[in-house]
Design a protein with these regions (language model features):
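A solvent-exposed, charged loop/short amphipathic helix patch at secondary-structure junctions
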Residues: 62-79, 117-146, 223-237
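Surface-exposed substrate-engagement region within the catalytic domains
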Residues: 3, 24-27, 143-238
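An active-site-proximal structural segment forming one wall of the substrate-binding cleft
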Residues: 70-106, 136, 140-159, 188-205
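Short, surface-exposed basic-aromatic patches at helix termini and helix-loop junctions that form
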Residues: 2-6, 40-43, 96, 119-126, ...
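Solvent-exposed loop/turn segments at secondary-structure junctions
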Residues: 16-20, 55-59, 108-113, 170-175, ...
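Active-site groove signature of glycoside hydrolases
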Residues: 91-138, 163-169
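N-terminal carbohydrate-binding/catalytic regions of secreted carbohydrate-active enzymes
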Residues: 1-94, 231-237
């Protein structure tokens, strides 16, 4: 529960469960009304809702595979992507109806896996079922990662101009994770340039960029994953 006057400006909620499983966010309340209620409750509390949309991983058939392969499998499956794009459309319909500011953090991790599977950091070289789904906002768009990004932006523009659209820049998408490699400043600039080039290859513009530090804290990785303390930050990390 939020206490009035506590000073927080945002609260966030993951939308998950897969687009074709029958247990995704759209089923949490009838016909996607979970988003409607969450936005309304946020506005009443004086905070901006942030939704992290994490649906491709748990969709079928890729959910049974390891995460990188499962994401790729789902992105290239026409039936899966049709249900997925319909699900994204439902979100924008619900969020757009509110008229208040909503932040949509679109698919953390997806872009990192796609970048690693692309040629020369070019999202247009990675196949994604987009136009071939015949989903109305995807018609005529290329069957690649750029087509996916362009479709999501087009949906937002048409259905929910009040939604701030967030791109997730996975800093490990280059294949090198700076959290572990401790790169020099020069090397870090090279990696950043590659991440920027991948984003630019998508041929459209999001509004804000999200980036992770870690998905677990350093002590968890040391004692549960047994990484020997490699995840702890030092003075060179910032």
């Amino acid at each position: 529960a939020r206490v009035a006057g506590d000073g927080f400006g945002f609260r966030y909620q993951y939308l998950a469960g897969g687009s074709n499983t029958g247990t995704g966010w759209a089923s949490w309340n009838p016909n996607g009304e979970f988003v409607t209620h969450y936005v309304s409750e946020s506005a009443a509390a004086g905070v901006t809702p942030v939704f992290s949309y994490y649906m491709i991983r748990q969709s079928i058939p890729g959910a049974s595979q390891d995460e990188p392969q499962g994401v790729r499998t789902n992105l290239q499956n026409v039936a899966t992507m049709r249900s997925y794009l319909d699900d994204v459309e439902l979100f924008f319909e619900r969020a757009g109806a509110s008229g208040s500011t909503v932040v949509f953090h679109f698919e953390p991790d997806l872009w990192g896996f796609v970048q690693q599977s692309s040629q020369d950091d070019d999202g247009r070289t990675f196949k994604v079922a987009v136009g071939s789904t015949q989903q109305k906002y995807a018609n005529g768009r290329p069957d690649n990662a750029a087509g996916l990004a362009q479709t999501v932006v087009a949906m937002r523009d048409a259905l929910a101009p009040n939604v701030v659209l967030g791109y997730h820049a996975s800093w490990w998408g280059t294949g090198e994770d700076p959290a572990y490699s401790n790169p020099s400043d020069h090397r870090m600039r090279e990696l950043a340039a590659r991440s920027a080039a991948f984003y630019e290859s998508l041929g459209t513009n999001f509004d804000v960029v999200f980036m992770e530090f870690s998905d677990r804290d350093a002590a968890f990785k040391q004692y549960v994953y047994g990484d020997g303390g490699a995840s702890w930050w030092d003075s060179d990390d910032f």
